Regions:
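Acyl-donor (CoA/ACP) binding surface of acyl/acetyltransferases
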Residues: 18-153
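Active-site rim helix/loop that mediates acceptor-substrate recognition in acyltransferases
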Residues: 1-11, 19
């Protein structure tokens, strides 16, 4: 699978998520998909953290911050969107923390584990990203403060 992800692809990019230590062991992966150069958009297709010791949210936040920066600053995209299962705790919270606007729900759009699930679409635009970046909203201390506010209210 990893070998198939290597190389040049016009419409998707995969990254390994590694430990921030001397080992640099792979703990997961992330990808941008559906990269459209005409519409200047892409999907935060997936974030998978396989090591439970790093599945506490901070690795997710760091990964999303990296994906935002890469999408808007390197690829010069105008729109970045994500799709997640309604009720998926990590995806839904991360979308709120990173100022992704809820665009809509596709009802019973996916069949998984013997039942249908709704899908939530979130997105952020280039100008919104830069406003929040300039305000320092993507600094970890501000993200943690927003997380506390979400949990308490």
């Amino acid at each position: 699978w990893v070998e198939g992800c290597k190389g040049h692809h016009d419409d998707y990019i995969f990254w390994a998520i590694c430990k921030d230590d001397e080992s640099e062991d792979i703990i997961g992966w992330a990808s941008l998909a559906n990269i459209n150069k005409v519409n200047k958009s892409a999907s935060t297709h997936s974030i998978v953290i396989g090591d439970r010791d790093y599945n506490d949210g901070f690795t997710w936040i760091e990964t999303v911050r990296f994906m935002f920066e890469y999408a808007f600053e390197t690829l010069k995209l105008n729109r970045l969107y994500g799709v997640s299962l309604v009720g998926h705790p990590m995806s839904n919270i991360i979308g709120d923390l990173m100022f992704m606007a809820k665009e809509g729900v596709l009802r019973q759009a996916i069949f998984k584990n013997g039942r249908f699930y709704d899908l939530l679409y979130n997105a952020i635009l280039r100008d919104e990203y830069y406003i929040h970046k300039e305000n320092g909203d993507y600094e970890m201390r501000k993200i943690i403060k927003r997380l506390r506010n979400l949990r308490h209210g």
